[in-house]
């Protein structure tokens, strides 16, 4: 349960994960009073300039610390000691609240500060964490209680003007940032046809869509992105290339297939709008898209990630997976295979809501990188992109 895990972690981790003689870094003032995030440096996507913060920190990291930056790991329900030990041993660089907390903003801030105290020289080379949550609104709002607004569903948000949504999103973002959450796994940019919305299990049935056409979805998704950015919170456009045309939910079902979406589909325009608005993260779905790549899930498809997302839509930020740790869509693959295949196909940041699965993926990636120079270069490029994103959100030790 998130509440118990968060409070336990806040109360017990003041000395955990530290090497002898080291001191836990004090939480940055930006946790409570952030300024706007900087635009991601162009070096993030073409091999960073030698003088950049990211490359300086990268050069000081061990290979294990670098690989640890590739992970966004769910921590709900995990004992505080296990989380701290995993960060110390496997150097995981980003952590994800999951489940529903009613502890309130003050308690969540305390937990987030305790998490950031784990960013020691030995654990993460003093690179602080993206602390993420799914704070979309409606049925998908993980942080609740005193200090948090009741965020309406995206379908309700879509009825606001874009300007009003941006204003309200900035307020929700300030709440997240005050709680120490600096990455929102939102907005949902999937376009769900109105005629099939109730049969669309992952999005429409939960009213997670802003509307039923690319224009409405794009405009309101961009407003959400801009509002959160004003508050200093990074955002994630999901679930590329869209879950609006499927029936099953990849969290709970395998073999989810989209037979409609192709490289020129109009529904991609909502994601294109988010990319033009400089969204820093795009999450890739765990469905199969027969008109794009009939042989691979999108998160394992170079056609989807390298061809469509990078080359056609010119996305230059961090590509993050949907849950590779516990989703039913990937249950038939070993964790080691999941992580390696995602990175090899063009992904950057691995989401795993399972700590054991994350550990298995981490170790497999380290082994493959040690044995394969080309894969090691792929890993290093992904790490640089993640570090550049962290630099933009003031999480690097260069400030």
Listing of model-derived features with the role each one plays in the protein:
Residues 68-75, 93-97, 129-135, 183-187, ...:
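Hydrophobic faces of well-ordered beta-strands that scaffold small-molecule active sites
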Residues 62, 82, 106-116, 215-370, ...:
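Second-shell residues forming the walls of enzyme active-site clefts
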Residues 40-45, 73, 77, 97-103, ...:
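Second-shell loop/turn segments in exported
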Residues 116-149, 168-195, 217-241:
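Glycine-rich, aromatic-flanked loop segments that form ligand/cofactor-binding clefts
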Residues 12-42, 46, 399:
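C-terminal region of N-terminal signal peptides and the immediate post-cleavage residues
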Residues 4-14, 134:
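Bacterial N-terminal signal peptides
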Residues 370-398:
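Mid-to-C-terminal alpha-helical segments outside catalytic/metal-binding sites
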Residues 41-110, 141:
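DNA-contacting surface of Y-family translesion DNA polymerases
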């Amino acid at each position: 349960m998130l509440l118990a895990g968060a409070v336990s972690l806040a109360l017990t981790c003041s000395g955990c994960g530290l090497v002898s003689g080291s001191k836990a870094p004090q939480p940055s003032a930006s946790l409570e009073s952030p300024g706007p995030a900087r635009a991601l440096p162009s070096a993030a996507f073409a091999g960073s300039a030698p003088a950049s913060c990211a490359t300086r920190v990268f050069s000081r990291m061990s290979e294990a610390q670098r690989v640890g930056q590739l992970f966004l790991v769910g921590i709900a329900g995990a004992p505080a000691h296990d989380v701290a030990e995993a960060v110390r041993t496997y150097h995981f660089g980003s952590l994800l609240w999951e489940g529903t907390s009613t502890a309130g903003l003050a308690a969540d801030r305390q937990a987030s500060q305790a998490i950031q105290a784990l960013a020691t020289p030995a654990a993460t080379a003093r690179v602080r964490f993206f602390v993420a949550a799914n704070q979309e609104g409606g049925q998908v709002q993980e942080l609740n209680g005193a200090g948090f607004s009741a965020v309406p569903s995206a379908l309700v948000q879509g009825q606001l003007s874009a300007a009003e949504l941006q204003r309200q999103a900035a307020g929700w973002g300030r709440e997240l940032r005050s709680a120490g959450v600096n990455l929102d796994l939102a907005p949902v940019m999937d376009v769900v046809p109105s005629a099939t919305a109730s049969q669309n299990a992952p999005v429409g049935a939960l009213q997670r869509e802003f509307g039923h056409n690319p224009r409405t979805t794009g405009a309101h998704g961009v407003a959400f992105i801009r509002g959160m950015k004003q508050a200093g919170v990074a955002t994630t456009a999901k679930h590329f290339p869209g879950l609006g045309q499927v029936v099953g939910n990849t969290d709970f079902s395998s073999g989810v297939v989209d037979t409609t979406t192709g490289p020129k589909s109009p529904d991609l325009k909502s994601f294109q709008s988010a990319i033009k608005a400089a969204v820093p993260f795009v999450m890739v779905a765990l469905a199969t898209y027969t008109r794009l790549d009939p042989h691979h899930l999108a998160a394992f498809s170079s056609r989807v990630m390298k061809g469509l997302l990078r080359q056609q839509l010119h996305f230059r930020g961090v590509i993050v997976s949907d849950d590779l740790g516990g989703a039913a869509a990937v249950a038939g693959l070993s964790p080691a295979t999941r992580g390696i295949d995602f990175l090899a196909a063009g992904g950057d940041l691995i989401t795993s809501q399972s700590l054991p699965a994350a550990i298995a993926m981490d170790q497999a990636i380290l082994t493959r990188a040690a044995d394969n120079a080309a894969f090691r270069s792929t890993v290093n490029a992904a790490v640089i992109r993640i570090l550049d994103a962290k630099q933009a959100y003031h999480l690097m030790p260069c400030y």
